[in-house]
UniProtKB/Swiss-Prot annotation:
The lineage of its organism: Eukaryota, Metazoa, Chordata, Craniata, Vertebrata. It is found in: Cytoplasm. This is Cytosolic sulfotransferase 2. GO terms for molecular function: aryl sulfotransferase activity; estrone sulfotransferase activity; sulfotransferase activity. It comes from Danio rerio (Zebrafish). Pfam families: Sulfotransfer_1. Keywords: Catecholamine metabolism, Cytoplasm, Lipid metabolism, Steroid metabolism, Transferase.
Length: 301
């Protein structure tokens, strides 16, 4: 399969935030809502769920290699990751609909990505008892990464300067809603739905091999240690950043002159962005928003 030509994909202007069922969204993720809501999941589907910029592409690529790295190696060089792991709610003019891509995936299982908060996930995933891999990233690094992503992605609302963006982040006025509700929603769901693996970005950076082994265990895969090691090497940040099939450089809505899609992939980069005052304010808001949850994050490793 050839790399798709999306050169005709044009966006007139950046989208506005809209309130959608109590969550901040843009039309690019709600215009196809009937089909998203009624999407028919299968029991062997694997839903990769994250708040934006928390490691979605990383886990998508790991899963793709675990399942199809050996049997379909040509996929790795001929198809961008966003064609192999459809973004379910995506609805951009000039791009295939996420639901259509998922419906026509030739693979089994079907790895499918979403940024939807837990309450908006199509109910068929829960009814079919599909496996869900959730990746969470500490709020400070997530905010920094999301800011740079919004700067370079014309499909996102205008972020303004760093301080403006940070205030919006603390208020939950970002696409896909508040970070706090997102990470807590899936954490709570995990208590009643056993087929969720809740992963942390920081753990993946600290020991990728260990987390790949955890994934294999959750998915019931008997991947050899040699194979896991090969995959772990192949998914290192700098390798993926140079890989056209994983770095999103084939999508024209992203302006790499402003910032690359894969920027640093580090833990603790927030220290290079937060002022002392911003950090104090953020910690105060965080304490309030996270006071009723048991989920714990690391802001450095």
């Amino acid at each position: 399969m050839e790399i798709p030509d999306f050169s005709s994909m044009k966006l007139d202007s950046r989208p506005e935030l809209i309130d959608f069922e109590g969550v901040s969204m843009t039309r690019y993720f709600t215009d196809n809502w009937e089909k998203v809501k009624n999407f028919q999941a299968r029991p062997d589907d694997i839903l990769i769920a994250t708040y934006p910029k928390a490691g979605t592409t990383w886990v998508s690529y790991i899963l793709d290699l675990l399942y199809f790295g050996n049997e379909s190696p040509e996929r790795q060089t001929s198809q961008p990751i966003y064609m192999r792991v459809p973004f379910l709610e995506m609805c951009f003019q000039g791009l295939p609909l996420g639901t259509e891509l998922a419906d026509t995936l030739p693979t089994s299982p079907r790895p499918i990505k979403t940024h939807l908060p837990v309450q908006l996930v199509p109910k068929s995933f829960w009814e079919q008892n599909s496996k869900v891999v959730y990746v969470a990233r500490n709020a400070k690094d997530n905010a920094v990464s999301y800011f740079h992503f919004d700067r370079m992605n014309m499909g996102q609302p205008e972020p303004g300067d760093w301080n403006t963006f940070l205030q919006k982040f603390m208020d939950g006025r970002n696409v896909f809603g508040p970070w706090y509700d997102h990470v807590n929603g899936y954490w709570k769901k995990k208590q009643t739905y056993s087929n969720i693996l809740y992963m942390f970005y920081e753990d993946m950076v600290e020991d990728t091999g260990r987390e790949v082994a955890r994934l294999c265990s959750f998915l019931g895969l008997s991947t050899s240690a040699t194979e896991r090691e090969r995959i772990t090497k192949g998914v290192q940040f700098d390798v993926m950043k140079q890989n056209k099939m994983t770095n999103y450089s084939t999508l024209p809505v992203m302006d790499f002159k402003i910032s690359p899609f894969m920027r640093k992939g580090k833990v603790g980069d927030w220290r290079n962005h937060f002022t002392v005052a911003q950090n104090e304010q953020f910690d105060e808001v965080y304490k309030q928003k996270m006071k009723n949850t048991t989920v714990k994050f690391r802001t450095e490793i």
